[in-house]
Each structure stands twice: as C-alpha cells, then as structure tokens.
From Swiss-Prot:
Organism: Nocardia farcinica (strain IFM 10152)
Name recorded for this polypeptide: Large ribosomal subunit protein uL24
UniProt lineage: Bacteria, Bacillati, Actinomycetota, Actinomycetes, Mycobacteriales
UniProt cross-references to Pfam families, sorted A to Z: KOW, ribosomal_L24
Region spans: Disordered: 82-104
Quaternary organization: Part of the 50S ribosomal subunit.
Entry GO terms, CC: ribonucleoprotein complex; ribosome
Family: Belongs to the universal ribosomal protein uL24 family.
C-alpha cells in the first residue's frame, strides 16, 4: 500500500470529497486508512463505570477507516499526486511523487 501513517491526504471521492487530513493509522490488509477529521461516524457506547466511579457512555463521534482508493497523497507543493518508487544509491526503495519526481 502506497499510503503510510503520517501522510497528508486529500479525499477524492465520497461524502467527504475535498477534505484534507493526516493519516492516523493504515490497515494494509484491508486497504483502508484512518484519516483525521474524515468519515466521522456516531457510535453508541454502553454506560460503564470506571474505577473512580465516573460513568462513561452515550453517543461518541469518531473517525472510521476509508478505502485507500478514495484518497490521494498530497506532496510538498500541496497538490495531490500519485506515488511511485525508485531505488536510491543504498538500494532502498524510496517513494516519489509522480507529478514532479521529488521524494516524499
């Protein structure tokens, strides 16, 4: 998967189209990423008392994973780009921007 944790991405389709956010977590097996502030859902959490006696529960708003095909990585210029790979002088694979050829 070409999108990694910490990347800034732009949502290109879906209900949050046009939103930018930082990837909080990547799920390579499911081809999904968790993006900060994008695809927010309301989750109903049961009441539970913690050790100090305070109860927590109710309706909680949180982010849900979004499919990786619905996001594009934003490069250093602030524009969305596709990702390519090249090998550096040490033989390691480095991600590059397909738009301008710079390292990401």
């Amino acid at each position: 998967m070409k999108v990694h944790k910490g990347d800034t991405v732009l949502v290109i389709s879906g209900k949050d189209k046009g939103a930018k956010g930082k990837v909080i977590q990547a799920y390579p097996k499911e081809n999904r990423v968790l993006v900060e502030g994008v695809n927010r859902i309301k989750k109903h959490v049961a009441n539970s008392a913690n050790q100090r006696g305070a109860s927590s529960g109710g309706i909680v708003t949180q982010e849900a994973p979004i499919h990786v095909s619905n996001v594009m990585v934003v490069d250093s210029d602030g524009k969305p780009t596709r990702i390519g790979y090249r090998t550096d002088e040490n033989g390691k694979r480095v991600r590059i921007s397909r738009r301008n050829g710079k390292d990401i």
